[in-house]
């Protein structure tokens, strides 16, 4: 039973692998960083996503894919309350336990985990436009120190 494990080949990771002479398992495929849309597609098409990213909570909740966060702490209590992601830390037995739990999660259009209400906002582009327009002069004056 073959499981592919694509991992983003960012410079920092590549340097760590090389400097520590780490031999990767043949199932781990280092890939060039993806565009955001390609990255989201990869996540949606995966059986489970293992990540240490802080945004995995929003992505998993909105796109409804199985996700395991490898951190031990996080800044997204609202997502943990809805159980959109299982938090495992780095211990092998906790990671395997998390993957086993995630097998029961529906994905795609069928849901058994609620989307986090804070992430299910209507009229986002309308609101962003109004916020930007409201702060243009303030940002130009305070941040960029432009005179009018």
Question: Model regions: which residues?
Answer:
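Nucleotide-activated sugar donor-binding and catalytic core shared by glycosyltransferases
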Residues: 1-148
């Amino acid at each position: 039973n073959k499981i592919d494990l694509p991992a983003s080949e960012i410079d920092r990771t590549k340097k760590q692998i090389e400097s520590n002479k780490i031999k990767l398992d043949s199932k781990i495929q280092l890939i060039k960083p993806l565009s955001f849309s390609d990255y989201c597609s990869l996540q949606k098409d995966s059986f489970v996503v293992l990540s240490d990213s802080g945004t995995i909570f929003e992505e998993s909740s909105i796109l409804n894919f199985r996700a395991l966060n490898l951190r031990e702490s996080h800044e997204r209590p609202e997502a943990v309350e809805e159980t959109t992601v299982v938090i495992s830390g780095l211990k092998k037995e906790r990671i395997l336990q998390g993957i086993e739990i995630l097998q029961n999660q529906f994905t795609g259009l069928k849901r058994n985990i609620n989307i986090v209400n804070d992430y299910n906002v209507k009229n986002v582009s309308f609101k962003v436009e109004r916020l930007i327009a409201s702060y243009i002069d303030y940002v130009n004056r305070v941040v960029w120190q432009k005179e009018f």
